[in-house]
């Protein structure tokens, strides 16, 4: 469970989250997971997700899965009071994962999904956009433990293709979207250990498409998981990339000193970091110039693993690119408090 302020004024700045994972409920090595999010201050939005996976004994490393998620946004406050904006979105999927290489130093997993996704946007009781797509996705992921250079590599590659467009003909929000589309997505991560208490983290995420995409398929930039100097979903596009470089250090100068928290060394309690983010987003139609976003920041993470894995994270980020944040904030502060029972 956790609470944070990672949302926006439109979706609700504060968020309360609860997630449950049930391992082997049927005694088959299966996993059931459920989560819910309620956002508030000043607007209210809700989101929930369910998933279930079960391994197949006939093929080692093969499992089948199914799941669904839904989010609902309602805005009727501030300058938008009276417009009664609503924006539900949902996805349902089924598929399989196959971990066909599973060694201590290397794991490789292939995946396939059939997805039905939909979104709707309403104002004043009128439907402005109603998008429904059937999508197929195939992908592969790799985890490599680099013992020689003391690091960990992660990579993910996926290809998504629309199979069927069941959207309404009228679309006032995204009238140029294509009925057929292909999307390639790539994610890379390198965790490099410099010493027992210092490490570098490099992250990259990118998306490429030659099509004008529906909202649920567009590349999103901004927020705690992207360019942190900007609000969540600051800009969207058909193509884009995001990269970040982070330096982390555990309790610099006093890591081996016993803390007053049951004598746990400070290096297990306090972690400091600095980071730099960079991103660029494009639209295929070329009607708008590419958007460039960049920011720098610092953060601190406080952990008490013996107290229900309590974790408090605080970070601040400042935009360094020419693009002015939509909400006008020059410094953005993120906070999150989480517990695991």
Locations of regions flagged by a protein language model:
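Transmembrane beta-strand segments of outer-membrane beta-barrel domains in Gram-negative
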Residues: 62-215, 281-284
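Transmembrane beta-barrel domains of bacterial outer-membrane proteins
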Residues: 31-39, 44-49, 77, 82, ...
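Transmembrane beta-barrel domains of outer membrane proteins
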Residues: 4, 21-23, 51-55, 67, ...
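C-terminal transmembrane beta-barrel domains of outer membrane proteins
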Residues: 172-341
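Short loop/turn motifs that connect adjacent beta-strands in outer-membrane beta-barrel proteins
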Residues: 25-31, 57-63, 101-108, 145-154, ...
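Transmembrane beta-barrel strands of outer-membrane/channel proteins
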Residues: 1-5, 32-38, 50, 66-72, ...
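Outer-membrane beta-barrel initiation region
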Residues: 1-64, 102
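Outer-membrane beta-barrel domain signature
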Residues: 5-9, 37-41, 79-85, 123-131, ...
């Amino acid at each position: 469970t956790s609470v944070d302020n990672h949302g926006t004024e439109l979706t609700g700045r504060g968020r309360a989250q609860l997630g449950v994972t049930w391992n082997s409920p049927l005694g088959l090595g299966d996993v059931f997971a459920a989560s819910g999010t309620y956002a508030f201050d000043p607007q209210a939005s809700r989101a929930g997700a369910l998933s279930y996976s079960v391994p197949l004994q006939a093929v080692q490393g093969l499992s089948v899965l199914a799941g669904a998620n839904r989010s609902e946004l309602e805005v009727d406050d501030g300058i938008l009071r009276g417009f009664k904006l609503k924006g539900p979105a949902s996805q349902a999927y089924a598929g399989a994962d196959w971990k066909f290489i599973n060694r201590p130093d290397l794991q490789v997993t292939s995946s396939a999904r059939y997805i039905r996704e939909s979104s709707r946007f309403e104002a004043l009781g009128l439907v402005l956009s109603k998008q429904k797509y059937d999508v197929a996705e195939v992908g592969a992921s790799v985890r490599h433990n680099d013992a020689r250079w003391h690091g960990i590599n992660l990579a993910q590659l996926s290809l998504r293709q629309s199979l069927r467009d069941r959207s309404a003909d009228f679309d006032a929000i995204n009238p140029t979207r294509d009925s057929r589309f292909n999307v390639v997505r790539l994610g890379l991560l390198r965790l490099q250990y410099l010493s027992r208490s210092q490490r570098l983290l490099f992250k990259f995420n990118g998306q490429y498409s030659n099509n004008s995409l529906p909202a649920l398929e567009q590349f999103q930039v901004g927020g705690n998981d992207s360019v942190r100097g900007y609000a969540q979903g600051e800009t969207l596009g058909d193509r884009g990339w995001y990269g970040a470089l982070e330096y982390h250090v555990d309790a610099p100068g006093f890591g081996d000193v016993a803390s007053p928290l049951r004598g746990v060394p400070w290096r297990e309690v306090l972690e400091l970091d600095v980071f730099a983010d960079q991103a660029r987003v494009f639209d295929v139609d070329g009607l708008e110039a590419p958007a460039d976003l960049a920011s720098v920041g610092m953060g601190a993470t406080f952990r008490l693993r013996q107290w229900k894995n309590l974790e408090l994270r605080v970070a601040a980020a400042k935009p360094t690119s020419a693009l002015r944040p939509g909400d006008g904030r020059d410094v953005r502060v993120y906070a999150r408090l989480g517990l695991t029972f």
